[in-house]
């Protein structure tokens, strides 16, 4: 009788463990769907969705699988209003992606001058370098944006 009870307890515990594991897996899948929605909204400039996420406490500097933040994505896609919304909500403009590039560097590559102006005001460290060893000044020179950077520095 003791063995049957013990075996029943073990089987119940295993069943509960598998159930919790499946539940955890489902939660992770749902969370990843929300992350994708947040980044899609930043990518296309859907500020209503971005604002909803931010107002509900979603981590504004969360990184996607490519190591980008929503601010980086919005800047690269030219979504000025979304960039402004994210900055006003506390997004960190100085974060770097897996290549060491910042949102400002992305805006310079895409020649998004008005976005670059907003991002430049974040005053990231001038010593910040990407993985290629380029600081902002050298990066701007390589991408033909040194005049743009000078104009940002003079404002």
For each feature predicted by the language model, list its residue ranges.
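Conserved ankyrin/ankyrin-like repeat signature
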Residues: 48-49, 81-82, 114-115, 147-148
């Amino acid at each position: 009788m003791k063995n049957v009870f013990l075996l029943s307890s073990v089987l119940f515990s295993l069943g509960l463990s598998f159930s919790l594991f499946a539940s955890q897996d489902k939660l992770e899948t749902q969370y990843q769907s929300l992350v994708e929605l947040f980044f899609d909204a930043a990518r296309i400039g859907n500020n209503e969705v971005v604002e909803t996420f931010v107002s509900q406490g979603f981590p504004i500097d969360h990184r996607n699988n490519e190591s980008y933040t929503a601010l980086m994505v919005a800047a690269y896609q030219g979504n000025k209003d979304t960039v402004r919304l994210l900055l006003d909500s506390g997004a960190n403009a100085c974060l770097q992606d897996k290549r060491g590039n910042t949102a400002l560097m992305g805006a310079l590559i895409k020649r998004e001058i008005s976005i670059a102006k907003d991002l430049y005001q974040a005053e990231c460290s001038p010593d910040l370098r990407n993985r290629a060893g380029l600081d902002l000044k050298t990066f701007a020179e390589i991408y033909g944006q040194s005049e743009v950077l000078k104009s940002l520095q003079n404002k």
